[in-house]
């Protein structure tokens, strides 16, 4: 049997090892924690996710993997359907797009502008930023009130530095196929509502990671790989790390290494907290201009969580990575007091990811194409959230597809 080295024990590396366990003799190298950004920290009675909060149940590959390894995801509480944005005051988000027209989230002028979306010509021949796309199709007010918080919540980024084509390829495709988002979503009978429901596991994402490892026949080694030459004994190599780590490991291939370095990352600090009483009972709150990008009301979403988490920084406030623990917690507490009027936490917990999430910047798709073409020249394979999809679901799907290629 051929020997395969997988560098990186996040969901991308681990799911790849699972899919290929009967085809290769596999060794997975991880420098830190199994699960990478999918890691649950237990602090007394509290479970705090260091990264991934959950996943939508609209990706067949993730659900299939859960079934194969024998773990049952749990659905988020009904409260998770209630979401807010904070724009000097808390505003409840409509749960269905039609409710936009009756809610007070947008001015009358803003609502009329949204309806004009039906008649805006599509732009398909060139790439656009999320900002350009949103203002062009839905207007400035929608852009400010919806896209700024959404980008912070999903990508820890800002719409002006994010590529619409790379970050939301499905929406871009709908625009180009149907001429308008509303026409397309209507034809697809989606009505613009989310296509899946949020799920996680009873004891957090680490429960899944541990089970996945348990069901995978591979050598799991805690070791930082500093140079690809350390893997000379293997027939095939997959790098499933962050792009900047891949760049370092592959430094001997200068052009490939330089291309990988071009994928920027945004920092995120996560502060776990609990207070005597917390409202609103909901999934959470996204902000438009605070240093805290959002507050996740974990205790109202999944069992055993008990606390809440504030997510700070991102591209909006990248200085977060240079603050010390005390300063980060103070920043979170100031925002929490402003937004939900809570003070004097019973507990505080902090995780700082200096390089949390890759930014899908303008030209990201071309950059990824160049990276993959260059890597293939050296028989090196890459997978992970830096390339073709940022979500937990995307990582599993992409590793499945790579596994199918490596089986051939
Ligand atoms: C704060 C935060 C919240 C998120 N929330 C969600 C969410 O709710 N839902 C969702 O779908 N997605 C979420 N994501 C995105 C999600 O984390 C990722 O898409 C996915 O978990 C990434 O998995 P990965 O295996 O590609 O990368 P990672 O999890 O980053 O794994 C890469 C691994 O490689 C290891 N490594 C790096 N260099 C080396 C080396 N030289 N040698 C050995 N090992 C090395 C690292 O230690 C790490 O474990 C979130 C991300 C963050 C940061």
What are the functions of these language-model segments?
Residues 30, 75-78, 220-227, 384:
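Short loop/edge segments at beta-strand edges and connector loops
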Residues 21-43:
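Glycine-rich FAD pyrophosphate-binding loop
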């Amino acid at each position: 049997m051929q020997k395969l080295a997988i560098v990186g024990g996040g969901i991308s590396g681990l799911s790849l090892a699972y899919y290929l366990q009967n085809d290769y003799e596999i060794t997975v190298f991880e420098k830190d924690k199994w699960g990478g950004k999918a890691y649950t920290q237990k602090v007394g009675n509290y479970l705090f996710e260091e990264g991934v909060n959950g996943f939508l149940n609209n990706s067949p590959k993730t659900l299939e993997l859960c079934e194969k390894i024998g773990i049952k995801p749990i659905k988020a509480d009904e409260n998770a359907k209630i979401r807010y944005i904070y724009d000097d005051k808390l505003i409840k988000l409509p749960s269905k797009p039609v409710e936009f027209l009756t809610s007070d989230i947008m001015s009358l002028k803003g609502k009329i502008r949204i309806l004009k979306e039906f008649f805006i010509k599509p732009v398909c021949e060139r790439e656009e930023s999320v900002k350009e796309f949103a203002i062009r199709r839905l207007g400035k007010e929608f852009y400010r009130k919806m896209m700024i918080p959404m980008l912070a919540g999903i990508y820890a980024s800002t719409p002006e530095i994010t590529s619409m084509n790379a970050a939301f390829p499905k929406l871009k495709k709908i625009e180009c196929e149907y001429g308008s988002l509303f026409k397309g979503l209507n034809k697809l009978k989606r009505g613009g509502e989310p296509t899946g429901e949020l799920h996680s596991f009873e004891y957090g994402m680490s429960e899944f990671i541990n089970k996945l490892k348990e069901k995978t026949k591979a050598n799991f080694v805690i070791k930082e790989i500093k140079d690809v030459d350390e893997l000379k004994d293997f027939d095939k190599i997959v790098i499933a790390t962050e792009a900047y780590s891949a760049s370092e490991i592959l430094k001997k291939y200068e052009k490939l290494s330089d291309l990988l370095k071009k994928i920027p990352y945004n920092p995120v600090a996560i502060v776990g907290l609990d207070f005597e009483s917390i409202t609103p009972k909901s999934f959470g709150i996204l902000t438009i201009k605070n240093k805290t990008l959002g507050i996740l009301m974990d205790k109202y979403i999944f069992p055993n969580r008990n606390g809440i988490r504030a997510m700070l920084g991102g591209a909006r406030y990248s200085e977060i990575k240079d603050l010390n623990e005390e300063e980060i917690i103070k920043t979170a507490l100031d925002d929490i007091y402003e937004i939900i009027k809570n003070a004097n936490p019973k507990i505080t917990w902090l995780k700082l990811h200096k390089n949390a999430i890759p930014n899908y910047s303008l030209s990201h798709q071309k950059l990824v194409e160049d990276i993959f073409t260059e890597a293939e020249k050296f028989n090196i394979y890459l997978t992970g959230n830096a390339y073709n999809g940022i979500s937990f679901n995307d990582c599993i799907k992409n590793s499945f597809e790579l596994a199918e290629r490596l089986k051939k």
